[in-house]
Regions:
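Conserved N-terminal alpha-helix of the aminotransferase class I/II PLP-enzyme fold
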Residues: 37-89, 115-122
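Positively charged, small/polar-rich N-terminal and surface patches that mediate targeting and assembly
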Residues: 4-11, 17-19, 63, 224, ...
Length: 398
């Protein structure tokens, strides 16, 4: 008997959707189905080999993948979902399926490095897809960039790493007036804070590696949209190109989902506290975080980010290049590493040689930190930053 989760809260659905007891064993938690093939029926010729619900071969889909897809689609408010090996695999699967030679794509000046390279380098050269890099916080700039062959507008919520905020509803309205599809990478916000489908976005992409898994021990990505489009992505991109998620990674992410809402609220609260403290420090040149009242898109962020502003912030110091590296050596709690959404806080210095730097606001041009705030005690995090600053004789205040 299928269960009805429609009236349940986000927190409850994160625990229960896709976590039904195993009918064969009675186990109340999902097993890991480490099989690459599944038993065929008596007459396999009568099967629909491309059906998503048919367990045939793990590249087509599997038990753990299916359970996770059900949960992610529900949490995002989407009709269906395809889970893949990584966030970049999810992005590539979407673009590969929906775009063709001669199409034009508008993408934001602030995007993840792999997305930037896909659109700015690979797709132009290899596939003949035209692209325009546009400040997607500027609706007039998007309007001017639209061409007769524009097929897709892609942006992030918020943007990585400047934390800019795009007006999702306004972009969707403009795009759909011109029969253009809209995709949003929601990784920095997560479905706990923002569900872009509620604003009319056609496709949402998530790096499940980040907040939704939350433990820094697996990789996965998801595309969420209509059932019709997800079936095309499964068949065209997952089955025929690859990029399928491993059963164990799907299981780890499914497990992470159960505590995801609780962790996400702590990420939100901690990041706001750290951002507010950083903004008061004389040694800090700027702080980019949409939860700050000083952020130019703060009011829009409040409208779109229902429960908080995410766990990532960026900031700069008054000082030269190597000061950033020296400060990091004094940190005890923060780990110098890429990624985000882990229980532990991470920090990375992005120097002046970042290939996207020319697209960022001027305050970023001298280099900056991108900080992924974890779920430690916020006072411990602030104290760790304070002592690291003071070790380099930087002025701080409480």
């Amino acid at each position: 008997m299928s269960k009805n989760y429609d009236d349940l809260s986000f927190v409850t659905r994160a625990i229960h959707v896709g976590n039904d007891a195993d009918p064969a064993t009675g186990a109340i938690e999902p097993a890991v189905y480490m099989a690459n093939s599944f038993l065929l029926p008596y007459d396999a010729s009568q099967m629909n080999w491309s059906a998503s619900e048919a367990n045939i071969y793990t590249r087509n889909g599997g038990v753990n993948q299916g359970m996770l897809e059900k949960k992610i689609a529900n949490l995002e408010g989407g009709e269906d979902c395809v889970v893949l090996a990584s966030g970049v695999a999810a992005l590539s699967a979407l673009f590969f399926t929906k775009l063709k030679k001669g199409d034009h794509v508008i993408f934001s000046t602030v995007t993840y490095i792999a997305t930037y390279r896909i659109f700015n380098e690979l797709w132009n050269d290899k596939w003949g897809i035209e692209t325009s890099i546009v400040d997607c916080t500027d609706l007039e700039a998007i309007k001017k960039a639209i061409r007769p062959n524009t097929k897709l507008i892609h942006f992030e919520t918020p943007g990585n790493p400047t934390l800019c905020i795009c007006d999702i509803e306004a972009i969707v309205k403009l795009a759909h007036e011109h029969n253009i599809l809209v995709s949003a990478d929601n990784t920095f916000s997560s479905p706990y804070n923002t569900r872009p489908i509620e604003y009319g976005v056609d496709f949402v992409v998530e790096s499940l590696t980040k907040y939704i898994n939350g433990h820094g021990d697996s990789m996965g990505g998801a595309v969420i949209g209509s059932h019709e489009d997800m079936e095309k992505i499964r068949y065209q991109a997952q089955v025929n190109i690859g990029g399928c998620i491993s059963p164990f990674n799907a299981w780890l992410i499914q497990r992470g989902c159960t505590t995801f809402p609780l962790r996400m609220q702590v990420h939100n609260d901690n990041a706001l506290a750290v951002a507010e403290w950083l903004e008061r420090q004389p040694c800090v040149s700027f702080v980019a975080y949409p939860g700050l009242k000083s952020h130019k898109n703060h009011e829009l962020a409040k409208k779109q980010m229902k429960h908080g502003f995410g766990g990532v912030l960026s900031f700069g110091l008054h000082g030269e290049h190597d000061l950033y590296n020296r400060v990091v050596t004094h940190l005890n709690i923060f780990t110098s590493a890429v990624s985000l959404g882990n229980a532990a806080s991470l920090i990375v210095f992005l120097g002046e040689d970042d290939e996207r730097m020319y697209l960022y606001p001027e305050e970023f041009h001298g280099g900056f930190y991108r900080v992924a705030i974890g779920i430690e005690d916020k006072n411990d995090l602030i104290h760790d930053l304070k002592q690291a600053f003071e070790a380099e004789h930087l002025e701080t205040v409480d």
